Swiss-Prot record:
Record key words, sorted: Lyase, Membrane, Metal-binding, Mitochondrion, Mitochondrion inner membrane, Transit peptide, Ubiquinone biosynthesis, Zinc
Protein name in the entry: Ubiquinone biosynthesis protein COQ4 homolog 2, mitochondrial
Catalytic activity: a 4-hydroxy-3-methoxy-5-(all-trans-polyprenyl)benzoate + H(+) = a 2-methoxy-6-(all-trans-polyprenyl)phenol + CO2
E.C. number(s) listed in UniProt: 4.1.1.130
Family: Belongs to the COQ4 family.
InterPro entries recorded: Coq4 (IPR007715), Coq4_euk (IPR027540)
Function: Lyase that catalyzes the C1-decarboxylation of 4-hydroxy-3-methoxy-5-(all-trans-polyprenyl)benzoic acid into 2-methoxy-6-(all-trans-polyprenyl)phenol during ubiquinone biosynthesis.
Pfam families: Coq4 (PF05019)
Compositionally biased spans, kind Low complexity: 21-32
GO cellular component: extrinsic component of mitochondrial inner membrane
Pathway: Cofactor biosynthesis; ubiquinone biosynthesis
Record membrane topology: Peripheral membrane protein
Length: 223
């Protein structure tokens, strides 16, 4: 007797209105989630394109074999620049990564990694450097190249590395090698190379540089 009797028709209408309201509320709160569109990656820069053309992918086992074989070949014949280059690439990743972190810590280093400048006859006006005063670094650099009949275009391409940015760091190291010779006033004979390798080893931490500095010294003979 406490419940008021409800007319069946009115009860049906009330239930229908309730269901309609609930459905509308659910539809209003349901949002359509669209799949994120893939952002196209920027095209590779000129250095990365060149590196990918020359790259030779190797497994870790192959990397170890190349490292051991190239080190032995370089010991037997220090003039095997191809073996020295292979040794540097297969053993130098930790040191190159440390160099990259150090470069990223400065504005100048970040700019170099972003622009990836090269040092060769296509990017540097050697004639303009030669025309500089004799006491200038640019003039002395060209004088060193001409005196020893070498060219910055002779540096080997990086092949046995995976990371293009680390490959650039290795390329940068190779292209400034003759600049170090110029600063130190060292020739390209065994004594000069050993001296340069010690400076490079202490500044880069590359195992190949330490190997060249230590084992190269054993090949020096008194005159």
């Amino acid at each position: 007797m406490f419940l008021r009797r409800v007319h069946p028709v009115r009860l049906g209408h009330a239930i229908q209105r309730s269901l309609t309201t609930t459905k509308s509320r659910n539809e209003s709160t349901t949002t359509t989630v669209e799949a994120p569109q893939a952002v196209p990656s920027p095209p590779p820069d000129a250095f990365t394109e060149e590196f990918l053309r020359n790259q030779i992918k190797v497994t870790e086992l192959q990397r170890v074999i190349l490292g051991v074989g190239s080190s032995l070949a370089a010991l037997v014949n220090p003039r095997r620049h191809d073996m020295i280059a292979c040794l540097g690439e297969t053993t130098g990743v930790p040191a190159l990564d440390a160099i990259r972190r150090q470069m990223l810590a400065s504005d100048e280093g970040r700019q170099i990694l972003a622009d990836r400048p090269r040092i060769n006859t296509r990017t540097v006006d050697m004639a303009a450097l030669k025309a500089l005063p004799e006491t200038s670094f640019g003039h002395q650099y060209v004088h060193f190249l001409e005196k020893h009949d070498i060219t910055p275009d002779s540096r080997a391409e990086v092949r046995f590395m995976d990371d293009p940015e680390l490959a650039y760091v290795m390329t940068r190291y190779r292209e400034v090698h003759d600049l170090v010779h110029t600063v130190l006033g060292m020739p390209t004979n065994m004594l000069g190379e050993v001296a340069v390798k010690w400076v490079e080893a202490l500044n880069t931490g590359l195992p190949m540089c330490y190997g060249g500095a230590v084992f190269g010294a054993f090949r020096l003979r008194p005159k």
